[in-house]
Amino acid sequence: MMGHRPVLVLSQNTKRESGRKVQSGNINAAKTIADIIRTCLGPKSMMKMLLDPMGGIVMTNDGNAILREIQVQHPAAKSMIEISRTQDEEVGDGTTSVIILAGEMLSVAEHFLEQQMHPTVVISAYRMALDDMVSTLKKISTPVDVNNRDMMLNIINSSITTKVISRWSSLACNIALDAVKTVQFEENGRKEIDIKKYARVEKIPGGIIEDSCVLRGVMINKDVTHPRMRRYIKNPRIVLLDSSLEYKKGESQTDIEITREEDFTRILQMEEEYIQQLCEDIIQLKPDVVITEKGISDLAQHYLMRANVTAIRRVRKTDNNRIARACGARIVSRPEELREDDVGTGAGLLEIKKIGDEYFTFITDCKDPKACTILLRGASKEILSEVERNLQDAMQVCRNVLLDPQLVPGGGASEMAVAHALTEKSKAMTGVEQWPYRAVAQALEVIPRTLIQNCGASTIRLLTSLRAKHTQENCETWGVNGETGTLVDMKELGIWEPLAVKLQTYKTAVETAVLLLRIDDIVSGHKKKGDDQNRQTGAPDAGQE
């Protein structure tokens, strides 16, 4: 008996699962995540209401926003959530479809694993299918003229129709297009569109959504420092600083020993002279506005006010950069180094308005702003947050088209066209790999199928007729009308998606499926007993599933 004792290699606290059990566990986890998100696809999508740990409410149908709030335990589910974030950062749209596709790719693979097919065979078939998917997409894509405003609005509209903001779609499309066109920047033949940095969304509760607009310039939530300063200036000369207009304390807070009273008065006098000198350096350039990221002392305010200069202090660094881009000023670190060409003269108007209880500074009517602020008004914070998320998506879509002006038909049409191409190609294939290859084509149909399901139409009947349609010549633009659940030509309906978004969606979905199929072992460590006691109140540990 002694020889048959089991040998313990792993520590007793660890739990190990391997083989088929792990694979089916991963596939189920991915399917669960995909099922949560499935109803959020298309124009007839449902909303999800999430309570975050702080008790705040998030209402959204944006795939990435939902998954960000969900807390999961299974490692495979975590990687699914990660891909939606990647998609959001990379192209800003398609977060819902990428999760649904990845879930479906894994779901169709389960059948082959049950038949004892080796995961590597499935993976290589998936890889081949991905290459063919990419080439088919490029074949059916059409170039677009980015200067054609109506066409651009149409593209953005297709992305917006699935969101809450679709009720105000023409307003939202115009806002997104204007904002992106404003921050577009070409240098040495290289296009740069940085929405995150230079197109800021400011949400102010109150008013109605129709009051929202794009400002040709910048808005900041600040008031002037001194009540007697001007609040309405036409064609202002703007000076931007990132140093404070206060007396410099010694860097190491040096102590000074004073023996006579005159010394103390002299020190105070020096402080005043220093501040006066700073202000004179600035006033020499005859600016109308001084904006600084740091503080302004009372004395400096007094000097500036006497020179009829408006001062604004403690502005965020990002806002300062935006003001610099909008009015053509340079941010200066030392007032004594100010020169004439550091002054921004590109703004047409500086105005300080009171909205609700707060004061806002508007720097608008800029001649050639390379930064802008989108001002959103609306009934409540929740609605504003959702509208902001939707606008971000719309701006990303617009940015993708400007950077890569290629389009593919929306509404599940490109998925069906690619699926049809894969099915045709699989007929010429021999060997075991043809089955998983064909399954990829099957998995792609999940997008039109979900669109049909979400608007409550008959899935089987419509999918069959859509398949039949795609076997005919020149019918690759036929898809599902998400509003009514009927089959239509997307060209006529005007529903297009940027090629960049589609390519990223397919690549990410297949890569994730491949990654999760590769896993055949999960070793999870237990928490130590002490940690266990501390966390009794929280959720159970990952090791104790």
Curated annotation (Swiss-Prot):
Record GO biological process: binding of sperm to zona pellucida; chaperone mediated protein folding independent of cofactor; chaperone-mediated protein folding; positive regulation of telomere maintenance via telomerase; protein folding; protein stabilization
Locate the N-acetylmethionine modifications and list their residues. Answer: M1
Q: Which residues carry this modification: Phosphotyrosine?
A: Y247
Q: N6-acetyllysine (modified residue): where?
A: K222
**Which cysteines are cross-linked by disulfides?**
C366-C372
- GO MF annotation, one: ATP-dependent protein folding chaperone
Q: What is this protein called?
A: T-complex protein 1 subunit gamma
Disordered: region residues: 1-24, 526-545
List the subcellular locations.
Cytoplasm
Q: Sorted alphabetically, which keywords does the UniProt record give? A: Acetylation, ATP-binding, Chaperone, Cytoplasm, Disulfide bond, Hydrolase, Isopeptide bond, Magnesium, Metal-binding, Nucleotide-binding, Phosphoprotein, Ubl conjugation
Please list the residues that bind ATP.
G42, G94, T95, T96, G411, G482, E497
Which residues are listed for ADP binding in this entry?
G42, G94, T95, T96, S97, T162, K163, G411, G482, E483, E497, K502
Which chemical reaction does it catalyze? ATP + H2O = ADP + phosphate + H(+)
Q: Tell me, how does this one assemble?
A: Component of the chaperonin-containing T-complex (TRiC), a hexadecamer composed of two identical back-to-back stacked rings enclosing a protein folding chamber. Each ring is made up of eight different subunits: TCP1/CCT1, CCT2, CCT3, CCT4, CCT5, CCT6A/CCT6, CCT7, CCT8. Interacts with PACRG. Interacts with DNAAF4. Interacts with DLEC1.
Crosslink Glycyl lysine isopeptide (Lys-Gly) (interchain with G-Cter in SUMO2): position given as K15, K248, K249, K381
- GO cellular-component term (any): zona pellucida receptor complex
